Amino acid sequence: MKVFCEVLEELYKKVLLGATLENDSHDYIFYLNPAVSDQDCSTATSLEWANTCGIQGRHQPISVGVAPIAVAPVCLKTNSQMSGSREVMLLQLTVIKVMTTRILSVKTEFHAKEQYRDVIKILLESAKVDSKLICMFQNSDKLLSHMAAQCLALLLYFQLREKITLSNSWIAFCQKNLSEYSESNKAIYCLWTLTAIIKEIFKDSCSQKTEILKQFLTHFDTIFEVFYNSLFSQHFENCRDTSKIVNILMCFLDLLELLIASRIHLKLHFTCQRILFLKPSCMLEVITWPIQAFVKRKVIIFLKKCLLCKVGEDLCRGSVPALMPPDHHVAVDMLALANAVLQAVNSGLLKTLSVYEKHSFFGGDEVQPECELITSPDHVILRAASLVIMKSLEIKFQNYSSASEVKVDLQRFMSELLTFLKPHLQPSLQLHNPCKWLSRVFIEQDDDMLEAAKASLGIYLTLTRGCEATESLTQGKEMWDHHTHENGYNPHCIFLFFLKNIGFDSTVLLDFLISSETCFLEYFVRYLKLLQKDWDNFFTICNNFDATESKYDISICGCVPSLVQDQSSNQTIPHRLTAPHSHRDVCARHSWASDAPSEPLKAVMSKGAHTMCASSLSSPRASQSLVDYDSSDDSDVESTEQCLANSKQTSLHQQATKEIQDAAGTSRDKKEFSLEPPSRPLVLKEFDTAFSFDCEVAPNDVVSEVGIFYRIVKCFQELQDAICRLQKKNLFPYNPTALLKLLKYIEVISNKTMNTL
């Protein structure tokens, strides 16, 4: 026993270091072959299994003269503690797991890797270790079961990588238990192992992932559909063992997410990868089951990931493969899922969705009678459900041919969504702009907020194109403006609320633009293109924001910012922006601001009347910038086609950059779009003065309130300057030249607007 444990410990240390083995590969099989009886899969109580389950006859234990190996301390039990068969098995499984991992690693030395490969092949072929591991992961000992499942998953992936015939015993085990799900308690073991293998495929850096996955899924394509139908056809309320269904459903969602991710990223089209899109109503019905809230939450989040094509990101330890170009088959499936979601919403799905989360308590799950229980909505479900509906609408409307049908459906579903959200958003949206729902629902999750804003903008643009194709530019304009506000998807309002949420801070926009996520870049580009065409409407909405907030005594950013007046200048900032004649008459069209006062926004406040706003024009975040923009020297104007040196451009960045190049490069005067930071008469000297953030009162006791239009223009100017300076230092991750052209054009039309005032 002592010698046996010493050999295992020494072998573990060698494999951990990736060192070569001194003995023949067959000599190690005796020590690595688990003590499991083939008859009853029970764990042996001693090491007497060597003559029955081990390799008999020829390969006897190695004569060990153990030499110490210098390694980092490892948590190995002493020989006396390892006397039990359980501890021996755990160490055996650990060695097998580490050895297999070493084989799959590119860092392992070639000779050592070949030795490890021989050992594992012998274990699989002669010792039938895969069959024993199948028995072991059904063990009541949870640790032993988990280790056995991990080892089995790695060994199966090893077989796939080495193009060895996949374990017949495991294939038979999975097919039997998945097809007999209702009678079997072992389906969860199959699901867990399948999930672990696909994770290994994603995690591996080899170039044959698609071929490996294709070989793997071939064995389970048919049986997986049978299991899917069986799982969702049962009536949950009539089941006795609900915990079994919950466990299997949670594990199944992880597996299904990886299958869909592999379908999107690796371009395979097995039925098991498409089953959700072929039968989406089955999954949606889970939300109506009398099941725990966390299960419904997982289902809704799963649907959100599918519609956003972000499946698999949280489950794969390694990086998910780069998103492939659009696939017609995937687009068709996404449309089927979107239609199913909207059909369920139309049938009253949101009315059955409870969003109040159950509170957890230390020491129990019930609140004491003397304690007050305050319930609050589950904002995770609110966000996920809202985004699922918005994305489904965007996908569905992309395939519509009639603008009138889009209008009718949009009004119906947005009414359903706003009615669903209304009880959970206080104060009520009716007091303010209905478009505010998006910023309030997603205030704690900026990535979901950007996805929702992008989807909303996509819906607006789709509907706009449809209306322009069937109506004149002026026909029905008033009704159109009213429709966008009433149904909460006006793109200008949504963008203004977004800027308010971030305090008009250009550094936040810069962070989003240089992020590895491209959602904001795509959204921002599309919005700037819209802004060029719809400037008058945007300007009017800015005025309406100021008027509405003045009526309800709501500051733009929660408190009134102070402007330090430049004593050397007699210029003052207009307190109210008067729209040019081309868009003055639009003000009254917006029902949410129709009763707003028309008086100018004026505020001259005494000392100490208001605290200083932390999100004023010169944001505190700007002083904490990663790059000292003011230290950058100006350089020559760069050409539109110039790429940044030493910068890595992803395919998505390139695609978005090309889009803005096409949009911004149309008939613009080259001199007008000079990329050098220009002198800007629009922002007056007082406006450009730095603010105080320690709640001090401005000199001369003058505190002025500035309209939202000025804040937006200032934010865009700061963003443009920051991008220019980063570009000159080759610090921007992609070529921003076309983006700068869009920002420059916005500045030009801003100046023209100011000149008309």
UniProtKB/Swiss-Prot annotation:
Expressed in adult testis, prostate, prostate, spleen, thymus, skeletal muscle, fetal kidney and brain. GO terms for biological process: cognition. The modification Phosphoserine is found at residue 635. The keyword Cell membrane does not apply. Pfam families: LINES_C, LINES_N. It comes from the Eukaryota. Keywords: Disease variant, Intellectual disability, Phosphoprotein. Belongs to the protein lines family. It is linked to Intellectual developmental disorder, autosomal recessive 27: A disorder characterized by significantly below average general intellectual functioning associated with impairments in adaptive behavior and manifested during the developmental period. This is Protein Lines homolog 1. It comes from Homo sapiens (Human).
